[in-house]
Amino acid sequence: MAISLCSALVLVTLSQAPPPPVAPTDSLATLRGRTARDSSDAQLWLLMGRAYLGLGVEAHGATHRSSEDSVWTRAVLDTAEEALGRAAALAGPLGSSAVGDSARVFRVGAWAARSWLGWEAGGVKAGVEAWGPLPMDLRVPPVLDELGENLLRACPAGGVLLTAGDADFYAAWYMRFARGLRPDLLVLPLAAWRSDAVLRARLMADLKLGRRTGDDAWLAELVRRRPVCVSMAFERPPETRPRIRWETRPLVWVAGPEGKSPRVPPRDFVFGALRLALDGSDPWAEPALAAYTRAARATPPLCDAMATFKVAADVPTCRK
C-alpha cells in the first residue's frame, strides 16, 4: 500500500516541488509508483523517506518557505517519518541491517526537523510537549548513542552545541530529547543557523543576541553570553572576525563563560559501542571514528581511554 499524504492539496504541492536529494532516476513520483507495486521493499521506503526529509530540511534553508506553508512542511516531515518508520520495520530489528539502521537514524532527523518548526513557533524553550510526543520505538544504532552521549558530556553547563553533519547532530539530538540527557544544552547544526533566517531570528531573540550582520558575527556575541561547544566532527572551529579564542577539550572546541562547570577528563569517555560497530562493519561507525580521530589528535590522552576499549589501533594518532 502506498503512503498517503495529509491532503490532496499537499500532494499537488509536492508534485510541483524541486527534485529531492536522491538518485536522479529515483524521483518522488517514481518511488511512489515503485512502493505501490512492492510495499515490502525496505530500501525503497528508505529512499522515499530520505527524499521527503530532504524536502522538509530544504524548507528551512535559504529559500525558507513562508509561515503559511508550515502545514506543507509538517506534512512533508510526517510523510518522511512514516516512510522511514516503515523501512525500519521491514528491515528487521536494530542492528540487523544497514538499511534498517539508516532508516532509524534519518527518522530521528525527521523529528529533529519537526523540532525546528516548534522552535520557530514557540521559541527555543518549546520542548517535546510542543512538537512530540516522540515515538517509543525511536532509536539510533549504539555507536551513535555513544557518540551523542560523549558529545553532550563534553559540553559545559548551559552551553550551545554546534554540530557538523547528520551523524553528530542526530546522535546528540537523540540523546538530548529522546533520552533526556543534558536538558541544559541547546543542540543545533551550524548549517541550520547559517541558512535558515527564520530559525536564526527566533534563536537570536530567545538568546537575547543583538541584530548582527556578516557571516558569523552572531557567534561572537553568543560566546560572550553562553558557553559554545563545537563538535570535532568539524575539521576546525568556525573562523570569525573578531577571532574567537577556542579552547581544545576532549571531542569539542569550547569558548565562552563556563562558570564552575568541571572539565570532563579524557578517561571518562567511552568507546565500547564503536568497537562493536567497527567489528560489525556498521556504516555509522565511519563518521564516529572520524570525529574521534580528530579528537585524539587534539587531545592525545584520549588514546588511553580508546585503548581501554580496544579501538586505539583504529585511530592513527593512537597507534604506537
Regions found by a protein language model. Name each.
Residues 162-166, 190:
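Short His-Asn-centered micro-motif
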